[in-house]
Structure formats: structure tokens, C-alpha cells
From Swiss-Prot:
This is FAD-linked oxidoreductase easE. Keywords: Alkaloid metabolism, FAD, Flavoprotein, Glycoprotein, Oxidoreductase, Signal. Pathway: Alkaloid biosynthesis; ergot alkaloid biosynthesis. Induction: Strongly expressed in planta but not expressed in axenic culture. The gene is easE. GO terms for molecular function: FAD binding; oxidoreductase activity. PANTHER family: FAD-LINKED OXIDOREDUCTASE ASQF, GULONOLACTONE OXIDASE. Its cofactor is FAD. The keyword NAD does not apply. Its EC number is 1.-.-.-. Glycans are attached at N46, N105, N370.
């Protein structure tokens, strides 16, 4: 026994285990520490970026004492509902949930005095202390150098559309890329390092939002693979995380399948071009590895496609939630129609909402690409509608011809309900499940277990098609993207309180994700951009072991000091929740795993 104890102690010491416990974690500089930049240094940074540095104050401060202003508070309450205003403002994310911390003294909730007394103090929460509204690559380089020199927590905000609040962190310096707005269309784009030309493409500044590129596409008669939310930045986390398009993914692939080149400022403040001919590792990582992780992307060039005509048909049914059996049967039939249409190269999206307390709506929207005859599209759907009628499932069918898809997409900023926050999560449905005889019914039964409130949303995004056909492309997305039929996104509304936020986060992780994964327990795959904010196994769920291992290797090479850390991002496992303190897991977990192995061997002998 004495020899065994000697072995254990020697083993632990050989790994540096005991000494590592004595070493405090290395943390970013905080405002109360001597390392924090003084006012002269902040002034110098501001001058170096042409006066674009903002000292961030919560927008809700005008609704609280001692800064309460009834008129200003009313204005902000109205503006805060506008997603475009939130995208452009350094002191806002798209959702108050990620502006607040976890305690009552970590928030500045933007609510009217009738809902919450104005006497309650306002706090910074998770908002950055400073934000650099960069207007050039030189600005980005200067801010990165400043953050490195002063060991500051650095975050990147594009438009603030983020399911886990990656655009903010307490006591941080923010790079706000929203104002990088250049758009340039090229009939035959020449990738750096290749003189052959890559065909039509459009180069987009990091701050270009979907509505802006869609409007530009109308004028120049092209379209791109993009999302539906008009104020999401197309070059930021959307593109770098994968980029799902409900209206063009099936026919043109994911957004990352169609990116030709990135312009990036790296962790050493170097401006580089990343494509298939230079900085290939960085280019690969930025095609699915996630935003805010490998550098600051200042522009990207993506393929442009003809803005083709289409016929859009929508089947809508309504039911009371109390009629569970009817509801499950009806949703199952709509999913069966979607599956049948997919087999005929027609893609679509199922959206489930609750317009009132007693009524649930389900709408199946189908896209007949390159079709101009509405009657022909409806004729193709008639057998399905007749079958629904036989089962006493009443639906309403509407169809329209769309000359160009850009004009069909939302071009104005979304207006959100006042005070309501949202949390969202996602999972993928495999081809194996969806294509099985009981696939649509299994999916519908799981959907029936999820609560849908008046501000909640449950919807699918069509995968398959060109996304599956692109399986030979070497990108940094989870391999399961290529073998999945649909992405399911579940959005839950949250009342404006810290308690409601805490409860909603717990329910997403402990209640609703298990329900979704029960659909196919052996197939747990989620979309990083819309994943569970508390996902414990994010490396496997978002990327898969092989892809993540390669991403982690590239991250260590390009950003060894962890300047770019984002929640549930590559390399974040070695940092605390807010990316402030370095707490390397491997130094402890590896020797413990090895010790456990040796103990098991000893027991067996």
C-alpha cells in the first residue's frame, strides 16, 4: 500500500497537478486593477480610430433614477422594439436577456415605470464598457493592438443577433463592425491567387445586413444564400457559423458552401486574405467554425446567383391545443406532404405559432423554384389537399407567383413585442428518421409535447437537396448537416425579469432539449448559431469530434493567447463562462483520467 501511495503522489506531481492547483488563473484586466487603461490611454485610442470610441451606458438608464427622463424613456421604449436600432446601437443586443447578468444588481431592464419602479438602480450587466464603432480595417487593427497591450476582454458585435450573447461580456471592449457597409458586385470575381475567375459574386462589408444585400440584389438582378431576418449581418456569425437559408438552402447549399474569400484581421492585428489558395486553414475554420473565434472578419465574398422566379404556396390549418390527437395527426400529415415535395425537389418550411390562447396555427410554405405557373403548382398539391379533406383536416391554400425572390423577403426591420425576451434552441432531423415510414408521425408527436405560447415559435428549415449534395466540400460544419433532412428551431418567449430568464434557461436545457432529442436519441446534433446556451457537450453536438479537433488545433495556432473567445466557441472550454479568466481544463482532467485508468488496472490485478 505504501508503494501505491508513493506512486500516486509521484504521478500527480509528474503532471504538475499539485502545483497547478496553487497557481491562480490568468485573467483579463478589470477596471479596478492597475493594468486598466487610464483616461489618457482611452482618449488616445479614440483619436487613433477617428473619434469612434463610445463609453457604453445602458439605454435603459433613462428609465431609472438618478437619470430618469420621462420623455427619453418613452422614446427608448419605442426604439428598443426595432431590431435595426438595436443592431446599430453599441449598448444593445437584439435581446435584453443577454444584456443582463444573473443577479438583480446586474441589469438595467428597459421597462416602463408602471411595470417596474424607476427607483430600482440601473447596472451595466453584461454590456461592454467601451465600444469601437470601426469604419475601416485600420480601426480594427488599432483596437486589437490596444486590447492585446492592455490584456482586455475583447468581444465582437456585428448586429447583436446571437442566441448566447456572444457580442457582449462584462468589463469588455467591443469591436462593433456594423458600420462596415461596402457592397460590390462582380460578374466574374477573381479570387486572390487565382486568375481563372469564379463567376458572379458579391463582396460584402462585415456590417451589411440581409435587407441591404437583398435590396442591392434587386437593383443588380442577383441573389445570395441568406436568411430571412432583415437585420442579421450576413458576414458575421450567420456566415461563419454555417448559414441556413429556408428559401435557397435546398437549391444552393449552406452559406458557407458559397463563400469564396474572407478578409480578416487576426489576433496579431495582421490583415490577411483567406481563401482556397492562401491561409487555407483560416479559410476552412471560418466556414462553419463560428464567429468571434478566429479573427475579425471585415469583409467576405460570396457567390451570386440569378434572382430566379418562383411560385410560393402555403397550406394553413388551425386547431385548439386541447384536441391533441387531431393536432398530432394534422402536423404529421403536413410533414408527410413536405417529405413528398422534397422528393420532387420542392422545398419548404413548417411554422407553428399560437395567435391566441386557444388556437394553434400551422403553416406549410412550399417553394416551387423556377416555376411561373401558379395553377400548375396548385395542381401538384391537389392530391395532398384531397387526402387531408378525407381525414377531415381542413386547410387553406394560398399561392402566388414571385418574379424575383429578393422582393419577397422582408426588407424592413422587425418590430418586437415590448419587453419580451426570447431564448432559442435547435436540433436536426436525420434523413434516416424523416424518411422512415413513421418519421413524420414521430416528429409530430415530439412537437406535440412542446408548449407553444402566444410569442413562441416552432419551425423547420429544409436541409437535404444541395446541402446534402455538397458533402464533398471540405468545410468546418458538423458532418451531420449533409445527412439531415431538416433543422428544427424552437423559440421561447421570456417575461422581463431575471427570475424568468433563469427559469427559461433551465427549462431549455433540462426539459425541452431532452424532449427534442427523444425524437432520435442516437442523433444529437444542433446548430451552433441557434443552440442551447447551456449545451455541455457543445464540441460534439455543434461540430463532431473530428471537426472540433481540427478547429481547436487551428485556434491554438492562430490565437494562442485566446484573444477571441466566444461562449460555447472553439477553445472556450479553457475559459470561464464570460471568457475573462483562463482555467485550462486539460491540465487537471488529463491526469485524473490517466489516474482513473491506472486505478482500474490495479483493481483488476
Amino acid at each position: 500500500m505504501r508503494h501505491f501511495v508513493t506512486f500516486v503522489v509521484g504521478f500527480l506531481l509528474s503532471w504538475g497537478f499539485l502545483s497547478s492547483l496553487q497557481d491562480p488563473p490568468s485573467c483579463r484586466c478589470r477596471p479596478w486593477e492597475p493594468c486598466w487603461p487610464d483616461s489618457h490611454q482611452w482618449t488616445s485610442l479614440n483619436a487613433s480610430i477617428d473619434g469612434n470610441l463610445v463609453h457604453v451606458q445602458p439605454v435603459g438608464s433613462v428609465c431609472h433614477d438618478p437619470h430618469y427622463d420621462a420623455v427619453a424613456c418613452g422614446d427608448v421604449l419605442d426604439l428598443s422594439r426595432n431590431s435595426g436600432w438595436r443592431a446599430s446601437n453599441p449598448a444593445t443586443l437584439q435581446d435584453w436577456i443577454w444584456e443582463t447578468g444573473s443577479g438583480d444588481n446586474e441589469s438595467c431592464l428597459l421597462v416602463s415605470s408602471s411595470e417596474r419602479p424607476q427607483e430600482i438602480p440601473c447596472h451595466q450587466g453584461r454590456l461592454p464598457l467601451y465600444s469601437a464603432a470601426v469604419k475601416s480595417t485600420a480601426h480594427v487593427q488599432g483596437v486589437i493592438r490596444f486590447a492585446k497591450d492592455h490584456n482586455l476582454r475583447l468581444v465582437i458585435k456585428n448586429t447583436g443577433h446571437d442566441a448566447t450573447g456572444r457580442s457582449a461580456a462584462p468589463d469588455s471592449l467591443q469591436i462593433h463592425t456594423y458600420f462596415l457597409k461596402d457592397i460590390h458586385y462582380d460578374d466574374n470575381f477573381l479570387v486572390h491567387g487565382d486568375a481563372t475567375g469564379s463567376g458572379p459574386a458579391v463582396t460584402l462589408g462585415a456590417g451589411v445586413v440581409h435587407s441591404e444585400v437583398y435590396k442591392h440584389g434587386i437593383d443588380h438582378k442577383y441573389s445570395v444564400v441568406g436568411g430571412e431576418c432583415p437585420t442579421v449581418g450576413i458576414v458575421g456569425g450567420f456566415l461563419q457559423g454555417g448559414g441556413v437559408s429556408s428559401w435557397s438552402g435546398f437549391t444552393r447549399g449552406l452559406a458557407v458552401d458559397n463563400v469564396l474569400e474572407y478578409q480578416v484581421v487576426t489576433a496579431n492585428a495582421e490583415l490577411v486574405i483567406a481563401n482556397e489558395h492562401q491561409n487555407q486553414d483560416l479559410f476552412w475554420a471560418l466556414r462553419g467554425g463560428g464567429g468571434g473565434t478566429f479573427g475579425v472578419v471585415t469583409q467576405a465574398t460570396v457567390r451570386a446567383f440569378p434572382d430566379d422566379p418562383t411560385v410560393v404556396s402555403t397550406l394553413v390549418l388551425s386547431s385548439t391545443r386541447a384536441d391533441t390527437s387531431f393536432w398530432v395527426k394534422a402536423i404529421s400529415r403536413l410533414l408527410s406532404i413536405l417529405r413528398s415535395c422534397n422528393q420532387q425537389n420542392v422545398h419548404g418550411q413548417l411554422i407553428i405559432t399560437r395567435p391566441s390562447v386557444d388556437i394553434l396555427n400551422a403553416g406549410l410554405t412550399l417553394h416551387f423554384s423556377n416555376m411561373t405557373n401558379v395553377l400548375h403548382a396548385e395542381t401538384l398539391l391537389q392530391p395532398h389537399i384531397a387526402s387531408l379533406s378525407e381525414d377531415q383536416i381542413s386547410t387553406t391554400l394560398t399561392s402566388k407567383f414571385v418574379a424575383n425572390i429578393n422582393s419577397e423577403l422582408r426588407l424592413d426591420a422587425d418590430i418586437h413585442p415590448r419587453g419580451i425576451g426570447t431564448l432559442q434552441t435547435s436540433m436536426m432531423i436525420s434523413n434516416e428518421l424523416f424518411g422512415s415510414s413513421e418519421g413524420p408521425l414521430t416528429v409530430a408527436q415530439v412537437f406535440g409535447k412542446l408548449p407553444i405560447g402566444p410569442n413562441d415559435l416552432l419551425f423547420t428549415s429544409n436541409l437535404g437537396g444541395c446541402i446534402a449534395a455538397n458533402k464533398g466540400l471540405d468545410t468546418a460544419i458538423h458532418p451531420a448537416w449533409r445527412s439531415s433532412a431538416h433543422l428544427v428551431t424552437y423559440v421561447r418567449s421570456v417575461e422581463p425579469s431575471i427570475e424568468a430568464k433563469k427559469l427559461a434557461l433551465k427549462e431549455i436545457t433540462n426539459k425541452y432539449m431532452p424532449i427534442l432529442y427523444s425524437m432520435q436519441p442516437s442523433f444529437k446534433v444542433s446548430y451552433r448559431n441557434l443552440g442551447d446556451p447551456n449545451e455541455k457537450n457543445y464540441q460534439e453536438v455543434f461540430w463532431g469530434e473530428k471537426v472540433y479537433k481540427r478547429l481547436a488545433s487551428i485556434k491554438a495556432k492562430l490565437d494562442p493567447d485566446g484573444l477571441f473567445i466566444s461562449k460555447l466557441g472553439v477553445g472556450s472550454e479553457d475559459w470561464d463562462t464570460e471568457g475573462m479568466c483562463y482555467q485550462p481544463q486539460n491540465r487537471v482532467s488529463q491526469p485524473l483520467r490517466s489516474l482513473k485508468y491506472f486505478l482500474s488496472v490495479l483493481k483488476d490485478t
